Amino acid sequence: MTAVAMGIPTVRSSVSLAGRPDVDQLVDRFGRVARDLRVSITEKCSLRCTYCMPEEGLPAIPAENLLTANEIVRLVDIAVHRLGVREVRFTGGEPLMRVDLEQMIAGCAERAPGIPLAMTTNAVGLEHRAAGLARAGLTRVNVSLDSVDREHFARLTRRDRLPSVIAGIRAAARAGLAPLKINAVLMPETLSGAADLLEWCLSEGVALRFIEEMPLDADHEWARENMVAADRLLAVLGERFTLTEHGREDPSAPAEEWLVDGGPATVGIIASVTRSFCSDCDRTRLTAEGTVRSCLFSDQEIDLRAALRSGAGDEELAQLWRGAMWNKWAGHGINADGFAPPQRSMGAIGG
């Protein structure tokens, strides 16, 4: 297999603010307000999930192009205090690949007290760091886990690390990183084990959310005719459990919730493709290289790193960020004629 390029989109240093109201928040032309910040801190990962990364991994980002821990802390500070962000989630790649993660979390917790600091992780090695991350100020984690069958897990991730993942999940629970949620990608390869995964999550007392696979794989092999839709999953789970529709926690929450066997336990389904929630999206994304991405599927990014390293003040950086979000698309366009997936894969963008 040949190496897969990072697929860098068009990166701009400025954008038009024409027509934008004079408000501090991250508003866009369709009336949405971004309050949920996703910060990708690395492209590196300890697994090679087939829907996210090629087997050999992604090309390394030159160290000088990565945001430092202090730069990330400053940008999070700006997002919270100038732009109205109310939640921050660290993603990758795999965030645990950064040895300065605890420093980063502690800095953000100090500069933005009271703001939830979350992390999406594969949990490999988390058993050794969960307590320290909690002490630093991390409040909760989501763990990517598609199977609790060791052989199946190894095929999906190309790594035999399931025991480490389970140990990490349990360590996170002991450290009080709650609510602890499991994210599982819906694929033909995972559908047969979906009920077993839900059974395991119920026994561990953790929430489970299934996510429809989106066209964000590094090998660009996603095909609509092969994807597993939410309705198919519901039929499969319904063979073992009684599911009762429970709606969404709030309008901007992506997961539709279903009570399992009358509750109180629930299972969530994020139907990103078949029942998109773009009209309620409240996310803004910062890549590991310091660019703002308004949508997973955007073909443009706005460069904050260059401005930051050139001495730009906080308000100048905030205004660049506002411009990036003002021009956000109405939706991801997956269901539109002529849709073209982004060149960056999920591993390069940050989940």
Curated annotation (Swiss-Prot):
GO terms for biological process: Mo-molybdopterin cofactor biosynthetic process. GO terms for molecular function: 4 iron, 4 sulfur cluster binding; cyclic pyranopterin monophosphate synthase activity; GTP 3',8'-cyclase activity; GTP binding; metal ion binding; S-adenosyl-L-methionine binding. [4Fe-4S] cluster 1 binds at residues 45, 49, 52. It is an enzyme of class 4 (lyase). Pathway: Cofactor biosynthesis; molybdopterin biosynthesis. It catalyses: GTP + AH2 + S-adenosyl-L-methionine = (8S)-3',8-cyclo-7,8-dihydroguanosine 5'-triphosphate + 5'-deoxyadenosine + L-methionine + A + H(+). Its EC number is 4.1.99.22. Pfam families: Mob_synth_C, Radical_SAM. Keywords: 4Fe-4S, GTP-binding, Iron, Iron-sulfur, Lyase, Metal-binding, Molybdenum cofactor biosynthesis, Nucleotide-binding, S-adenosyl-L-methionine. S-adenosyl-L-methionine binds at residues 51, 93, 144, 214. InterPro entries: Aldolase_TIM, Elp3/MiaA/NifB-like_rSAM, MoaA, MoaA_twitch, MoCo_biosynth_MoaA/MoaC, rSAM. Binds 2 [4Fe-4S] clusters. Binds 1 [4Fe-4S] cluster coordinated with 3 cysteines and an exchangeable S-adenosyl-L-methionine and 1 [4Fe-4S] cluster coordinated with 3 cysteines and the GTP-derived substrate. Residues 29-243 form the Radical SAM core domain. The keyword Ribosomal protein does not apply. The keyword S-adenosyl-L-methionine applies. GTP binds at residues 38, 89, 120, 181, 283-285. [4Fe-4S] cluster 2 binds at residues 278, 281, 295. Its cofactor is [4Fe-4S] cluster. Belongs to the radical SAM superfamily. MoaA family. Catalyzes the cyclization of GTP to (8S)-3',8-cyclo-7,8-dihydroguanosine 5'-triphosphate. Monomer and homodimer. This is GTP 3',8-cyclase. It comes from Rhodococcus jostii (strain RHA1).
